[in-house]
């Protein structure tokens, strides 16, 4: 039995190839059935995200294993093998275990240390268990990878610092306000970045969010998801005074929030502080706003400096995480080898017990027929000894004939000979 990890990701293949190799959720069961129908595959998990498609397999070793699996993948997706081969990576046993642990821990992600991948790996594993998981070794490898990912998160700072603009904006807000549950947040725009910001804020228990956008329909979809109120851009001047935090990211060529607008809002708020985070390029907030007392303005460049600093911290934490992964992968493979040895030990003991029971039964039958007890016991001891040492003796003789001193020494050690 061999453990394998093979696939492509954002580092080895462009999106034009990744999208052709991806497995859609509605066809995943069919793909797993097809994969497990391959004679060499004992168990399999398919991980398919926007940045990677990977197969994790428990397989029987054979000479054409790699070619057979590449051929299956290409046939399933109607791909030319040459198109895929140069982008495909292949990891076996310890390297496969280490790769999965790195993926689950966010060490192989586009954004170093991002936590979402662990949930995606867990879902891929759960999907495989719906009648598809047949290999206990593969199941144990995934369960171990989940605990390693948790250990990496607990023992290192790999996920402690923001490395995306959206996450950095939310982190900044959490640093300035003791609790986000009591603040009002105004989000300007409804694009991808604002969507991420809104979801982060919801996770941190923000109770009141207002979304201002040029088109109400797009904003309403996001508002329904996060429980926010939708207003028009033209309503910002009137509603700005309610906001403790303003995060803006639109494609407007001109500023949406001016100095005068913020001055009026601060006056209505009796100069309670406001945090303004302008993620847009060109800027949505006039730079002069930053000169106002109690208005704390951060631009996308300010966030980038935070992100650069945090990324350096994550890279340092990744070194610690890699050490954890290497240690855990080594220990898992030692456990796997022990499991393989235990099966051999069980077979050996079963064989010896069978010989013992067979010869003991014959000896007892002879005693019941009135045979000489001493002679019967001596015969039992002689036959039992010969039967038990027969196979090791043949192995020693063969090693001697072959001049294989290394094997001779291994056999001597196994038999406890000094």
From Swiss-Prot:
Record's comment describing the protein's domains: Possesses an unusual extended V-shaped dimeric structure with each monomer consisting of three distinct domains arranged along a curved 'spinal' alpha-helix. The N-terminal catalytic domain specifically recognizes the glutamate moiety of the substrate. The second domain is the NADPH-binding domain, and the third C-terminal domain is responsible for dimerization.
EC supergroup of this enzyme: oxidoreductase
The keyword NADP is assigned to this record: yes
Reaction catalysis annotation: (S)-4-amino-5-oxopentanoate + tRNA(Glu) + NADP(+) = L-glutamyl-tRNA(Glu) + NADPH + H(+)
Binding site for NADP(+): 189-194
Function: Catalyzes the NADPH-dependent reduction of glutamyl-tRNA(Glu) to glutamate 1-semialdehyde (GSA).
Family (UniProt): Belongs to the glutamyl-tRNA reductase family.
Pathway: Porphyrin-containing compound metabolism; protoporphyrin-IX biosynthesis; 5-aminolevulinate from L-glutamyl-tRNA(Glu): step 1/2
Name under which the protein is recorded: Glutamyl-tRNA reductase
Record's miscellaneous remark: During catalysis, the active site Cys acts as a nucleophile attacking the alpha-carbonyl group of tRNA-bound glutamate with the formation of a thioester intermediate between enzyme and glutamate, and the concomitant release of tRNA(Glu). The thioester intermediate is finally reduced by direct hydride transfer from NADPH, to form the product GSA.
Organism: Escherichia coli O127:H6 (strain E2348/69 / EPEC)
EC number(s) on file: 1.2.1.70
Oligomer status and interactors: Homodimer.
Active-site residue numbers: 50 (nucleophile)
Site (Important for activity): 99
This protein's UniProt keywords: NADP, Oxidoreductase, Porphyrin biosynthesis
Positions with a binding annotation for substrate: 49-52, 109, 114-116, 120
Keyword Phosphoprotein: no
Highest taxon, organism lineage: Bacteria
């Amino acid at each position: 039995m061999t453990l394998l990890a093979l696939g492509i990701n954002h580092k080895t293949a462009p999106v034009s190839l990744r999208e052709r190799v991806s497995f859609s959720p509605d066809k995943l069961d069919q793909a797993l059935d097809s994969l497990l129908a391959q004679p060499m595959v004992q168990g399999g998990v398919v991980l398919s995200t926007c940045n990677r498609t990977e197969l994790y397999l428990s397989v029987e070793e054979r000479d054409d294993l790699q070619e057979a699996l590449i051929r299956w993948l290409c046939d399933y997706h109607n791909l030319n093998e040459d198109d895929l081969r140069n982008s495909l990576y292949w990891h076996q046993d310890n390297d496969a275990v280490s790769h999965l642990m790195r993926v689950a821990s966010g060490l192989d992600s586009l954004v170093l240390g991002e936590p979402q991948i662990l949930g995606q790996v867990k879902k891929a594993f759960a999907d495989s268990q719906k009648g598809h998981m047949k290999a206990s070794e593969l199941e144990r490898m995934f369960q171990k990878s989940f605990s390693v990912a948790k250990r990496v998160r607990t023992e290192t700072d790999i996920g402690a610092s923001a490395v995306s603009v959206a996450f950095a904006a939310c982190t900044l807000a959490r640093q300035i306000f003791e609790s986000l549950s009591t603040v009002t947040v105004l989000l300007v725009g409804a694009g991808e970045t604002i969507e991420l910001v809104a979801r982060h804020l919801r996770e941190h228990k923000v109770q009141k969010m207002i979304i201002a956008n040029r088109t109400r329909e797009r904003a309403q979809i996001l508002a329904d998801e996060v429980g926010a109120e939708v207003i028009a851009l033209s309503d910002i001047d009137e509603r700005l005074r309610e906001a403790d935090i303003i995060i803006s990211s639109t494609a407007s060529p001109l500023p949406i929030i001016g100095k005068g607008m913020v001055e009026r809002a601060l006056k209505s708020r009796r100069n309670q502080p406001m945090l303004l985070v302008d993620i847009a390029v060109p800027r949505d907030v006039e730079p002069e706003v930053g000169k106002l007392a109690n208005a704390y303005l951060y631009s996308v460049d300010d966030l980038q400096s935070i992100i650069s600093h945090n990324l350096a911290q994550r890279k340092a934490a990744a070194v610690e995480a890699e050490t954890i992964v290497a240690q855990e992968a080594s220990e898992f493979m030692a456990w796997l080898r022990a499991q393989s040895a235990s099966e051999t030990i069980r077979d050996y003991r079963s064989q010896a017990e069978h010989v013992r029971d067979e010869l003991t039964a014959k000896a007892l039958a002879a005693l019941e027929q009135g045979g000489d007890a001493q002679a019967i016991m001596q015969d039992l001891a002689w036959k039992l000894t010969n039967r038990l040492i027969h196979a090791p003796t043949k192995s020693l003789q063969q090693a001697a004939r072959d001049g294989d001193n290394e094997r001779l020494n291994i056999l001597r050690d196994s038999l406890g000979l000094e």
